[in-house]
């Protein structure tokens, strides 16, 4: 009995992790509002959030070209405000996905709430205890062209943006694209020239580029080094002074924009929202403008930088909501969540993503179809820019036809399926959406080449393919024609999308020694001479390998395809014929010889007819195997087919 009593006393002394830090923070909430790092990080009371009317809230994002220092700058701002401790945690704190850390790129936009005390005069805020404190919502965005949709969704929750430019590399292709995304969203743009500590840094040249390309006053640019901390003290004051506060009506019924969502095994769907009007409290009833379904708010809070419950969110603030959504289909990105039983005008939402690359995803083992379906459903909750439809292949069985924003987007999605959900996936050759017109005047958009049936009764009269406007920036270090007198050349071309989705970017980097940068934007469809190419194994078409190519390149591409397949398909006990065909015409062929068992090994001399009988029997057996046998196509073969270039 004494032991049991001691156990009960011990149990009463158990404190949940973080509870002590939370209680200390709640006793001293002013420490959360310091412009210096605080030793105590904890929760934030809803009553404390009430001290931040929209006039003292700033929502801003960081946009830049790849590898110009966005994530490092975000780390320094989190440290400067005491949101994370200096030297604690991992670099690029907001890059939380494994794929982001392995590739060194930002894939998902991440939000963090910071508290910062700022005075509107020249005295430091630390010397003015009555200086007003501000709530700052920082959104770190991706820089690669394939994730521009992620950037545009993040900007919808912001009123301003930090445009980060490398002091050595200057304005790059994606810098231009991101600037116009922010400009079209009517955001206040603060130029930040980063990496000024580099030996090759030339801030004056970058200022001149900003003036020439964007008409930005050079005096507005901030000179910083996120690595050394130089100049960072001027960034947050500029955010507060130059970026307007979020608009909204505090006394109206609550209205929120659903920015993003992801699935948690225990909590269900966690939604990231921006409160446009009113206030959201735990226990409130909210409804979806898209589905009409009603939910109860089970938890609400901010990202500080992890999920921190507050019990309330006020006008202009960005945070998370857990409302008991169990299906990822209920959380529609861009949806308006509002107070139940109230009539509100839905928010504009987002433009639907335009999918540029399509690929089939199939489970490596046909019995894993349900597991793959479940994994894709969870992942698309966190990546709303992917389209998914079910399809069936005679070669690979049940699978999915998925639409992506680009080849890197597709590659990252595959990697996340494997790393986060343990799915083993076979992916087919990526294609782009084509438009075909038949002789009777009917048109059809083809996203899967296998769906383009070879119907002799319906003659294809014309076909169109999507094009893009490509922007290529070449610096002075490369030898340019004499007509280019400036520090760099900005080249614009109209290119077929199919030509750039595979290896155009890598080839451009190769021939320019890595100096050129590349970006593209969607353009119109253009008429072209296209044909469907089928791959046949032993005379049977493999629908998962069908592709659409330009007619003049069909023979070369067909030859490359069959050559690669011959290298990666394992030899069988029967002969395998690999063919590439356009319609009924075979344009390339390779033969994979059969493995041969030495059936004469046990014959030592003797009558020759005995040997002939054994050889004839083996020959008949191979014919029978070829007739009923199936050819196993390894995943490596599909990967190699992706590398077949259409641009040479």
UniProtKB/Swiss-Prot annotation:
Which UniProt keywords are given for this protein, alphabetically ordered?
Answer: GTP-binding, Hydrolase, Membrane, Mitochondrion, Mitochondrion inner membrane, Nucleotide-binding, Protein biosynthesis
Q: Chief localization class? A: mitochondrion
Gene Ontology CC terms:
mitochondrial inner membrane; mitochondrial matrix
- Report the protein's function: Promotes mitochondrial protein synthesis. May act as a fidelity factor of the translation reaction, by catalyzing a one-codon backward translocation of tRNAs on improperly translocated ribosomes. Binds to mitochondrial ribosomes in a GTP-dependent manner.
Task: Write the protein's name.
Answer: Translation factor GUF1 homolog, mitochondrial
- Keyword Nucleotide-binding present in the record's keywords: the answer is yes
Which biological process, per GO, is one annotated for this protein?
Answer: positive regulation of translation
**Which family would the database say this protein is a member of?**
Belongs to the TRAFAC class translation factor GTPase superfamily. Classic translation factor GTPase family. LepA subfamily.
Report the catalytic activity.
GTP + H2O = GDP + phosphate + H(+)
Residues binding GTP, per UniProt: 64-71, 140-144, 194-197
Say if the entry is tagged with keyword Cell wall biogenesis/degradation. Answer: no
Cysteine disulfide partners in this protein: none
Q: Where in the cell is it found?
A: Mitochondrion inner membrane
Pfam families in alphabetical order? EFG_C, GTP_EFTU, GTP_EFTU_D2, LepA_C
- Membrane topology, as annotated: Peripheral membrane protein
Q: Which organism is it from?
A: Oryza sativa subsp. indica
EC number per UniProt: 3.6.5.-
């Amino acid at each position: 009995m004494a032991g049991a009593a001691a156990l009960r006393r011990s149990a009463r002394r158990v404190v949940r992790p973080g509870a002590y830090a939370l209680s200390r923070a709640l006793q001293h909430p002013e420490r959360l509002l310091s412009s210096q790092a605080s030793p105590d990080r904890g929760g934030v009371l809803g009553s404390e959030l009430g001290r931040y009317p929209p006039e003292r809230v700033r929502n801003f994002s960081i946009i830049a070209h790849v590898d110009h220092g966005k994530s490092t700058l975000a780390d320094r701002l989190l440290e400067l405000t005491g949101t994370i401790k200096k030297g604690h945690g991992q670099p690029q704190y907001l890059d939380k996905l494994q794929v982001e850390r392995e590739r060194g790129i930002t894939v998902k936009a991440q939000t963090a709430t910071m508290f910062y005390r700022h005075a509107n005069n020249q005295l430091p805020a630390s010397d003015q205890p009555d200086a007003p404190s501000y709530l700052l919502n920082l959104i770190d965005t991706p820089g690669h062209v394939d994730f521009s949709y992620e950037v545009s969704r993040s900007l919808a929750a912001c009123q301003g943006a930090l445009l980060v430019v490398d002091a050595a590399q200057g304005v790059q292709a994606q810098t231009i694209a991101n600037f116009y995304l922010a400009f079209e969203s009517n955001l206040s743009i603060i130029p930040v020239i980063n990496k000024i500590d580099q030996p090759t840094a030339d801030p004056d040249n970058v200022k001149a580029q900003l003036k020439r390309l964007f008409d930005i006053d050079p005096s507005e640019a901030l000179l910083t080094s996120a690595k050394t901390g130089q100049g960072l003290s001027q960034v947050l004051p500029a955010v507060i002074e130059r970026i307007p506060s979020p608009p909204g009506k505090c006394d109206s019924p609550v209205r929120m924009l659903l920015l993003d969502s992801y699935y948690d095994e225990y909590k269900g769907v966690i939604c990231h929202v921006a409160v446009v009007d009113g206030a959201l409290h735990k226990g409130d009833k909210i409804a979806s403008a898209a589905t009409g379904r009603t939910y109860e708010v089970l938890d609400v809070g901010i990202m500080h930088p992890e999920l921190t419950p507050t019990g309330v969110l006020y006008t202009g603030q960005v945070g998370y909501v857990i409302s008991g959504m169990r299906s990822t289909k209920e959380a529609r990105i861009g949806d308006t969540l509002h107070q139940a039983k109230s009539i509100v005008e839905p928010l504009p939402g987002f433009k639907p993503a335009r999918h540029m690359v399509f690929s089939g995803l199939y489970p490596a083992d046909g019995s894993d179809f349900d597991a793959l379906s479940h994994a894709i459903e969870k992942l698309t909750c966190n990546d709303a820019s992917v389209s998914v439809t079910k399809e069936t292949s005679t070669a690979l069985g049940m699978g999915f036809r998925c639409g992506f924003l680009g080849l890197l987007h597709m590659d990252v999605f595959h990697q996340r399926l494997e790393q986060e959900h343990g799915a083993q996936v076979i992916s087919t050759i990526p294609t782009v959406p084509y438009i075909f017109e038949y002789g009777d005047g009917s048109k059809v958009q083809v996203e899967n080449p296998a769906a383009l049936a070879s119907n002799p009764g319906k003659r294809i009269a014309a076909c169109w393919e999507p094009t893009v406007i490509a922007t290529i920036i070449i610096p002075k270090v490369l030898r340019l024609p004499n007509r280019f007198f400036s520090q760099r050349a900005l080249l614009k071309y109209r290119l077929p999308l199919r030509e750039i989705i595979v290896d155009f970017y890598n080839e451009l980097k190769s021939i320019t020694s890595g100096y050129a940068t590349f970006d593209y934007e969607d353009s119109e469809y253009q008429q072209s001479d296209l044909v469907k190419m089928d791959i046949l194994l032993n005379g049977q078409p493999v629908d998962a390998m069908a592709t659409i190519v330009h007619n003049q390149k069909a023979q070369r591409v067909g030859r490359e395809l069959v050559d690669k397949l011959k290298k990666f398909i394992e030899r069988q006990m029967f002969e395998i014929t690999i063919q590439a065909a356009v319609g009924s015409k075979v344009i390339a062929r390779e033969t994979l010889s059969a493995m041969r068992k030495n059936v004469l090994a046990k014959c030592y001399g003797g009558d020759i007819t005995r040997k002939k009988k054994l050889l004839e029997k083996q020959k008949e057996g191979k014919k029978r195997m070829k007739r009923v046998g199936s050819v196993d196509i390894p995943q490596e073969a599909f990967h190699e087919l992706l590398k077949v270039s259409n641009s040479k």
